[in-house]
A protein has these predicted regions:
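A short, acidic/glycine-rich surface segment
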Residues: 54-60, 123
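Core segments of cupin and vicinal oxygen chelate
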Residues: 4-53, 81-83, 87-95, 99-101
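Active-site beta-strand termini and strand-to-loop segments that position acidic
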Residues: 39-42, 105-108, 118
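Short secondary-structure boundary/capping segments
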Residues: 38-39, 60-63
Length: 123
């Protein structure tokens, strides 16, 4: 068995796909539409987004609407990546459990995700 996609529920799949496309540089799937959009990774793993009409974004941390999954992205420079992602529309929750090693951000649909320092520059 091989993992082929991670899919996030949201109200606007194309808008959320555009955010993650700008954030990651992944290529949009050519058949993306208003109900289901995807970005394709080089390794065959897709990041996908499906429309849910009454989507309620998870909170961080919020037991009333807890996160059920989050993605972590390794970056070269935490501060630079945070600044860039905030300009793209990410949010930054007040609760940051270890801001020196990673940062918790939220995408425009409210899903928490982390950026983690330590990505080596390509040779």
């Amino acid at each position: 068995m091989k993992l082929s996609a991670i899919t996030l529920d949201c109200a606007d799949p194309l808008a959320l796909a555009a955010f993650y496309q700008q954030a990651t540089g992944l290529e949009p799937h050519p058949k993306s539409d208003a109900d289901f959009a995807a970005l394709e990774g080089d390794n065959g793993l897709s990041l996908a987004f499906q429309r849910v009409d009454d989507h309620r974004p998870p909170g961080w941390p919020d037991p009333a609407v807890p996160q059920q999954l989050h993605c972590c992205f390794r970056v070269t420079d935490l501060d630079e990546a945070e600044t860039r992602l905030l300009k793209l529309g990410a949010g930054k929750p007040e609760h940051q459990p270890n801001a020196g090693r990673w940062r918790v951000l939220t995408d425009p649909a409210g899903h928490p995700f982390c950026i983690v320092g330590g990505l080596a520059e390509p040779e």
